From Swiss-Prot:
Tissue expression profile of the protein: In stage 3 embryos, both isoforms are expressed in both somatic and pole cell nuclei. Expression in pole cell nuclei is sustained until stage 9 and weakly expressed after pole cell invagination into the abdominal cavity.
Pfam family for this entry, one: FHA
Gene3D superfamilies tied to this protein: 2.60.200.20, Transferase(Phosphotransferase) domain 1
Family: Belongs to the protein kinase superfamily. CAMK Ser/Thr protein kinase family. CDS1 subfamily.
GO CC, alphabetical: cytoplasm; nuclear speck; nucleus
Phenotype of null mutants: Does not affect male germline stem cells maintenance. In the germline, RNAi-mediated knockdown of Rtel1 in lok mutant background results in partial rescue of single Rtel1 knockdown phenotype which includes loss of germline stem cell and reduced levels of Stat92E expression.
Lineage, uppermost ranks: Eukaryota, Metazoa, Ecdysozoa, Arthropoda, Hexapoda
Biological processes, Gene Ontology terms: apoptotic process; cellular response to gamma radiation; cellular response to X-ray; DNA damage checkpoint signaling; DNA damage response; ectopic germ cell programmed cell death; germ cell development; intrinsic apoptotic signaling pathway by p53 class mediator
Residue ranges annotated for the Protein kinase domain, each copy included: 174-441
Reactions performed catalytically: L-seryl-[protein] + ATP = O-phospho-L-seryl-[protein] + ADP + H(+); L-threonyl-[protein] + ATP = O-phospho-L-threonyl-[protein] + ADP + H(+)
InterPro entries according to UniProt: FHA_dom, Kinase-like_dom_sf, Prot_kinase_dom, Protein_kinase_ATP_BS, Ser/Thr_kinase_AS, SMAD_FHA_dom_sf
UniProt-annotated catalytic positions: D303
Name of the protein in question: Ovarian-specific serine/threonine-protein kinase Lok
Keywords associated with the record: ATP-binding, Kinase, Nucleotide-binding, Nucleus, Serine/threonine-protein kinase, Transferase
Amino acid sequence: MARDTQGTQGTQSQASNIWTQVESQPMEKIVWGRLYGKNIKIKSLGTSSKYRIIYTHSSFSVDLNNDEFTAGRGEANDLILTLNDLPEKILTRISKVHFIIKRANCELTNPVYIQDLSRNGTFVNNEKIGTNRMRILKNDDVISLSHPTYKAFVFKDLSPNESIGLPEEINKTYYVNRKLGSGAYGLVRLVYDTRTCQQFAMKIVKKNMLSGARPSTNFSDPDRVLNEAKIMKNLSHPCVVRMHDIVDKPDSVYMVLEFMRGGDLLNRIISNKLLSEDISKLYFYQMCHAVKYLHDRGITHRDLKPDNVLLETNDEETLLKVSDFGLSKFVQKDSVMRTLCGTPLYVAPEVLITGGREAYTKKVDIWSLGVVLFTCLSGTLPFSDEYGTPAAQQIKKGRFAYGHPSWKSVSQRAKLLINQMLIVDPERRPSIDDVLQSSWLRDAPMLQKAKRLMKLDGMEIEEENFLEPPTKRSRR
């Protein structure tokens, strides 16, 4: 038995030593990019030996496998440029550190940046970056030094190509990054403007997905699509997601929109279970201003729900923006109603009653706002198939209740406003101006916060929109 024990211990000790040796060996770094010499031979690497030379036919190349790669005349650079590499007339115009190429954490999902630190210029595809400025490098970009005609390097991005199949107009302007989300009509990707490095969300909408089984003459008409896109692009309000760019193709529409880092309102509600009355009020007030802006311009959203409300930051007090307000204009009416009838939880009763076959007014947005406010305050829906009768029947009759325990701490004024917005008869439902003048929103501290947040966008909002109307002392 003693021998067995010793044998076991010896095996464990041997395995431990092997594991220690493996741990002590440096892990091979991921090569995320490569620089090929174009009119330059890459010979003079820095003494740190972080990079290895690979000879390829008539030129040299260097693998990029660290967070940063520097090039210039200085001896501390990863690539030291000397007379062996460049003609003297060019070398004299090279700075000690001419440029830096970097990719955060060497992650293939992160974009590659090039920063110009030179006095005489670093150029990408003949365009000057500018001292201390950055731009994004893409596969096959050509880097020139001191003058656009001196093409020194070609950059190769070794990460997966996410831009395959996208229009040339998109690939020329944007670096296409990871998927942010997807839905019935297409997907959303994170993109970067290569010149400004600004982030955007690019929504790719497939036209054949929108038009349904039957051909949609409205949607397939390029002039109609482009006209609606122009309307969306001209909208400018702090609480409405801006369209930065639009590319219309026969099979798809590519909409480049503001990127909101705080996610959507639905996830914010889910992660908190519900929102406090103060935060609900701050968010709701901003939503109302967005809807007022749209209604004043003859635009009805038609699909207001927490999924379509985006938050600028992860902070509790943050700017809020309504999105997807123009999508319904692209969609054939019958197709829209088939979609809405599948999940009618935020849809006004008049839409369900008529099946979308009759005209309806802006009051459909007021109903949806009421449902959104109900959800914010309680973390529950006013209408659901789980409540016994089908949700569509509950909506048509306007039957809902404040049964959740969270309603005990909600003010009567908030409930009164919800009651008014969820009136089945649209003629009796308040307008967006009426909602904004409701007693519940006469809250000076909230109005000041909203004013501060809504001006972050650099837009002037009329002062009277934020003034508390004269009223008697409010009661809860």
